[in-house]
Amino acid sequence: MTHIPKTPADTETLLSEVQGWKHRHVLDLDNFSREELDMVMQTAGVMLDILSRPVKKVPALKGKTIATLFYEPSTRTRSSFELAAKSLSADVLNLNVSQSSISKGESLLDTLDTLESLGADMVVMRHPLSGAPYLAANNCHANIINAGDGWHAHPSQALLDIFTILRHKSSLEGLKITLIGDIKHSRVAHSNIWGLSKMGAKITLCAPYTLLPEGLNTNSKIFPEVTLETDIKQAVSGADVVMGLRLQRERQQSGLLPGIREYARYFQLNEEILKLAKSNALVMHPGPVNEDIELSQSVVHGEQSVIKEQVKNGVAVRMALFYLCSGSKEI
């Protein structure tokens, strides 16, 4: 069972437990052990306590510089990382891609060289090409935190999803967690499959055939607890957690869907469908939500929704990642 610290008294315990952290970068969750995932959860619990204090700031990363490098638009993720860095007293360098040398054709590696020359100790990056953060990690000295690369991965989102579930459930072991939406093109889904599996959850992926991942079958060797489903009623039945995923409009243009309304008719999580889940089931979504398409408006704002809590917890989880990767010994 994962213990999430909820009081300041746990800080000393945390400092003695996180010394075994080995990762310089956070690129995805495939190379994280169960123990390392637990370590992130424990650290995030302490960070969440810090954020509840009158002064929401500690000097753990004072003197460090964290750069944000986003090649794709982002509001909540970029703001969350920036607030996390500032809450640890780090200096933040925001690079505006549209107004930088990148818009003139500067390469990723040249941009990273520039950021390192400016003193960046860590770089949070989002890139449209899968694998770009790995290229960065192999070619610069700064810590790289992947804030989303192509269809590949979004590890901090998966970690905050796990953390949010653990704020309500004592363990993920044996929980039925259903993900509904564009699984095939969702970096959030891909990282969650790794993270939730390692935490012992039973995962159901629900989507039209055209939006289910190729090469992943029910009860596969790598993910024996993953089930693929095209019937939303079967997918949601008995679920402990139901997570909607953003339907990207460009998928309709590519011919993978007959239409947005057609999708909503068969795959929208509404109150009637939600009744098939357990009575205490959590409703989640990484955002932004297309209301009345992926989730009905009443479900988004209903009592079982923890979507706003996910946003809040995201800051604590990203603080934890900064803290752990920095090697800091103080909070």
Swiss-Prot record:
Biological or metabolic pathway of the protein: Pyrimidine metabolism; UMP biosynthesis via de novo pathway; (S)-dihydroorotate from bicarbonate: step 2/3
Which biological process annotations from GO are given for this protein? 'de novo' pyrimidine nucleobase biosynthetic process; 'de novo' UMP biosynthetic process; amino acid metabolic process
Judged by the first EC level, this protein's enzyme class is: transferase
GO cellular component, alphabetical, reads: cytosol
InterPro entries per the UniProt record, alphabetical:
Asp/Orn_carbamoyltranf_P-bd, Asp/Orn_carbamoylTrfase, Asp/Orn_carbamoylTrfase_sf, Asp_carbamoyltransf, Asp_carbamoyltransf_Asp/Orn-bd
What is this enzyme's EC?
2.1.3.2
Q: Does the keyword Transport apply?
A: no
Give the UniProt keywords, A-Z: Pyrimidine biosynthesis, Transferase
Q: Which residues bind L-aspartate?
A: 104, 187, 246
Alphabetical list of Pfam families matching this protein? OTCace (PF00185), OTCace_N (PF02729)
Gene3D superfamilies hit by this protein:
Aspartate/ornithine carbamoyltransferase
Q: Which of this chain's residues are annotated to bind carbamoyl phosphate?
A: 76-77, 126, 154, 157, 287-288
* Reaction equations catalysed: carbamoyl phosphate + L-aspartate = N-carbamoyl-L-aspartate + phosphate + H(+)
Gene Ontology molecular function: any one: amino acid binding
Write out the function statement from the record: Catalyzes the condensation of carbamoyl phosphate and aspartate to form carbamoyl aspartate and inorganic phosphate, the committed step in the de novo pyrimidine nucleotide biosynthesis pathway.
Binding partners and assembly: Heterododecamer (2C3:3R2) of six catalytic PyrB chains organized as two trimers (C3), and six regulatory PyrI chains organized as three dimers (R2).
> What HAMAP family does the record point to?
Asp_carb_tr
**PANTHER family the record matches:** ASPARTATE CARBAMOYLTRANSFERASE, ORNITHINE CARBAMOYLTRANSFERASE, MITOCHONDRIAL
Q: Per the similarity annotation, which family is this?
A: Belongs to the aspartate/ornithine carbamoyltransferase superfamily. ATCase family.
What is the name attached to this protein's record? Aspartate carbamoyltransferase catalytic subunit
Q: Which organism is this entry from?
A: Dehalococcoides mccartyi (strain ATCC BAA-2100 / JCM 16839 / KCTC 5957 / BAV1)
The primary gene name is: pyrB
